[in-house]
Curated annotation (Swiss-Prot):
Gene Ontology MF terms: 3'-5'-RNA exonuclease activity; magnesium ion binding; polyribonucleotide nucleotidyltransferase activity; RNA binding
Residue ranges of domain KH in the record: 554-613
Any GO BP annotation: RNA processing
UniProt xrefs under Gene3D superfamilies: GHMP Kinase, N-terminal domain, K Homology domain, type 1, Nucleic acid-binding proteins
Region feature (Disordered): 695-745
Annotated protein name in UniProt: Polyribonucleotide nucleotidyltransferase
Lineage per the UniProt record: Bacteria, Pseudomonadati, Pseudomonadota, Alphaproteobacteria, Hyphomicrobiales
Family: Belongs to the polyribonucleotide nucleotidyltransferase family.
Originating species: Methylorubrum populi (strain ATCC BAA-705 / NCIMB 13946 / BJ001)
Catalytic activity entry: RNA(n+1) + phosphate = RNA(n) + a ribonucleoside 5'-diphosphate
Protein's cellular compartments: Cytoplasm
Recorded name of the encoding gene: pnp
Source species, domain of life: Bacteria
Xref: HAMAP family: PNPase (MF_01595)
Role, per record: Involved in mRNA degradation. Catalyzes the phosphorolysis of single-stranded polyribonucleotides processively in the 3'- to 5'-direction.
Amino acid sequence: MFDVQREELIWGDRKLVLETGKTARQADGAVVATYGETTVLATVVAAKEPKAGIDFMPLTVNYQERAYAAGRIPGGYFKREGRPSEKETLVSRLIDRPIRPLFVEGWRNDTQVVVTVLSHDLENDPDIVSMVAASAALTLSGVPFMGPIGAARVGYLNGGYKLNPLVTEVAESTLDLVVAGTQDAVLMVESEAKELSEDVMLGAVMFGHKHFQPVIEAIIRLAEKAAKEPRDFSPPENADVEKAVLDICESELRDAYKITVKQDRYKAVDAVKAKVVAALCPAEGEQKFSPEKVKAAFKEAQSKVVRWNILDTGSRIDGRDVKTVRPIVSEVGVLPRAHGSSLFTRGETQALVVATLGTGEDEQFIDALEGTYKERFLLHYNFPPYSVGETGRMGSPGRREIGHGKLAWRAIRPVLPPAHEFPYTIRVVSEITESNGSSSMASVCGGSLSLMDAGVPLRRPVAGIAMGLILEGERFAVLSDILGDEDHLGDMDFKVAGTDEGITSLQMDIKIAGITEEIMRVALAQAKDGRAHILGEMAQALTAARPELGEYAPRIETMQIPTDKIRDVIGTGGKIIREIVEKTGAKINIEDTGVVKIASSDGKAIKAAYNWIRSIVAEPEAGTIYDGTIVKIMEFGAFVNFFGAKDGLVHISELAPQRVAKVGDVVKEGQKVKVKFLGADERGKIRLSMKVVDQETGEDITEKLKAERAERGEPEREERSDRGDRGDRGPRRDRGERRRESSGE
């Protein structure tokens, strides 16, 4: 029934198994990949006919995690998986980016790659396994895919590289890098690093490329046994139409691409395009070529004109040379009520970035396969259509916005202060108000400035720069701080962020079949120079965090209490903690370790809450005299609030030196008194005395009373440790039960 084919190999000290022929047999390609005990299913389905009227390759990648993979039931009301999580979106992009350039040019059939996590051992992250499985499924499917690709995660531990580190090892590593590529070249890099050098980063990329070669070889062996017949597809011949278009528009396109203002340049290019379409696709008469082919050829002509000009003259669209960064203006404190804000402008790219500080209550709960955890640093990136002078959809963030936000998050996170030094939840929001290339890196620069404006003590300022590439045969040019057109018409988008000490984040997307180590080395060196220049420009606004938090930011006071006192601070059903919050106005967060965080923008509120909690957890000293207030009168004595929130009992025998017949004859509720703390009994009940304290002066008169008794010839009274408990007895029926128990009934 099943024609199962398998390939196994030991990879990074663990077994990798690729299997096909048993699961999802109606898909064009299906592979189950298992690494350790993490298992994913990757499927590929491509439409039988091309999609009409489009000039792009319609590829969709969906990565989905199932809660059962980790033996969990989803949270929420419906108890089933819902919209994609942030991680699912990011891994979908991670799979998409290295495979998209490898489809044959002109492929217009809807193609969908679906990767489902079936089992997760909580040690091997499913993302690398998913990339490998997707590559294998595409290679088997028969679609025109020039793969396979391999992928690997690289860590940097104790001065050495680690292939596919476990989840626990990644947390300890100074590098988390994912690299993907073919046998010959690197296609994609995604990483977060703790200020590592360019040499270490490049070494990690090449280390990963070398060590995923056995995976590519295993996929090839599997394809030799199980691949389907290749689709009958030939790339369209467009040489004639491309020549006709270029003959008409080359000169005018060159002139249009000398216009430095983006909107004016776009108008000029659109005018040239309209002229070409009118010439080759007239409304009346014979059309030499279809409008779709002419428009596609015009796009190719745009690319050729821009690329030739850069390679031949070294001059770019806006007149810069390949290494020059656009003019930069950095401003901070631009929003009066925000905790921290900045407006970062680089050429025609602009980001308004705002930092907000919160308490532990504001941390984000993330429900992942590994379990639920809290995240204290959030970075959100918004790209409204007006930023490029267009109308468009508004609403929840798309994949691009989530991906760009995560890239900026990775760039800034390594320089944040640890939570025990700066116990705030931090949210950064980047509003892209203008865009002409590299808006994610503008978010990094603006985010760094806004955090320093808010008083967040970053280890060092962070800047980011986007590098581009023009590659024609043996000739290439690496471009610093690329424009949007250079991104669209070029071969690479290589983003590098870091401090003056090293790289914190690196992302590379290649639109061709890969780049060499030499090109990456040149790009990293050029990016380092550009990053240093940008940091210098940012320093004109701020060089370090402000010494004080923003005027409207909350202040947080941290205190440590004994863990056995947490219950006392919270109270029954949260009664006490709610009362503290309501009366002081402060926010309070108590951790299981006994760490208490008190937050408010009002210093007096923090002090009041701090003293209140301290009074609950602090212990009075035996023999010490305290001021107190009568809070309740009983037949057997009076309860006194005497030590912050602590109450204790003054037994009727301890109210006055003389015999007291009725408690109300001596004290009234609300009366201010002075009491001596006698201690606590074995049940923790607090015993107090008024009779041994001079209520006028607060003096301890114990010895004076002893002397008076001695003069009267009265015997010395022995202190009874349980006298304070006599009035705390239960109802008569309870006492009767105790007597019956003692008599053996």
